[in-house]
Curated annotation (Swiss-Prot):
GO MF: ATP binding; ligase activity, forming carbon-nitrogen bonds; zinc ion binding
Protein name from the UniProt record: 7-cyano-7-deazaguanine synthase
Organism in which the protein naturally occurs: Cupriavidus taiwanensis (strain DSM 17343 / BCRC 17206 / CCUG 44338 / CIP 107171 / LMG 19424 / R1) (Ralstonia taiwanensis (strain LMG 19424))
Gene3D superfamilies per the UniProt record, alphabetical: HUPs (3.40.50.620)
Function in brief: Catalyzes the ATP-dependent conversion of 7-carboxy-7-deazaguanine (CDG) to 7-cyano-7-deazaguanine (preQ(0)).
Enzyme Commission number, as recorded: 6.3.4.20
Entry similarity comment: Belongs to the QueC family.
Cofactor or coenzyme needed: Zn(2+)
């Protein structure tokens, strides 16, 4: 019997690669995205394209407005998205508890459909400032999942996978290309326009562009005219 996996899918480069990895491992993939009040809808449109291209059995977009809380440059217009390169400490683009919220939604869906594997694109190399992208976080969440669910308590354990957590962006891109990922479908920019074109200057754009250079692969990203 084919095993089912829930894959968190933002529409960006990392999550697209993880979806391809889960599929390559033989999982029947269920993609989960969240409309949480992010600055633009382009990444969700990208998520739809990626889910279709990579054969997700289902793709659900859940609405949960984190703009009501703010606390991040991605959900609060009063905070600017940095364009001067990564700095020390936790970046202002960190969305409070976002991975925990999304993994919890994925956990609920997994238990409902009989899946026991959760995949997400945490990366501790390029995004080392995010507390919910560390290996110890992944291990802790897996422990929680097995303490907080009927399936886990009954011994039908959940597994949380973060397959790109120790990979550089260049390594991620090369792995994705080997698995057939079309990165022109993805949007990574924190402030993409309505057409999905990247700003070219935010930290996410900088890291993405450098990743394609490191991978020795042409960058398919569409940039805004001023980028």
């Amino acid at each position: 019997m084919t095993q089912r996996a829930i894959v968190l899918l933002s529409g960006g480069l990392d999550s697209a690669t993880v979806l391809a990895m889960a599929r390559a491992q033989g999982f029947e993939t269920y993609a989960l995205s969240m409309r949480y009040g992010q600055r633009h809808s382009s990444e969700l449109e990208a998520a739809k394209r990626v889910a279709a291209a990579l054969g997700a059995v289902r793709h659900e977009i859940v609405d949960l407005d984190l703009r009501r809380f703010g606390g991040s440059a991605l959900t609060d217009d009063a905070l600017e998205v940095p364009t001067d390169g990564a700095s020390g400490g936790i970046p202002v683009t960190y969305v409070p508890a976002r991975n925990t919220i999304m993994l919890s939604l994925a956990l609920g869906w997994a238990e409902a459909v009989g899946g026991r594997d959760l995949f997400f694109g945490a990366n501790a190399v390029d995004y080392s400032g995010y507390p919910d992208c560390r290996p110890e976080y992944v291990a802790a969440y897996e422990t929680l999942a097995n303490l907080a669910t009927k399936a886990g308590v009954e011994g039908d354990r959940f597994r949380v996978h973060a397959p790109i957590i120790d990979m550089t962006k260049g390594e991620i891109i090369r792995a994705g290309i080997a698995l057939g990922v079309d990165y022109s479908l993805t949007v990574s920019c924190y402030q993409a326009d309505d057409d999905g074109r990247a700003c070219g200057v935010c930290d996410s754009c900088r890291i993405r562009r450098a990743g394609f250079e490191a991978a020795g692969v042409p960058d398919p990203t569409r940039y805004q005219a001023a980028a």
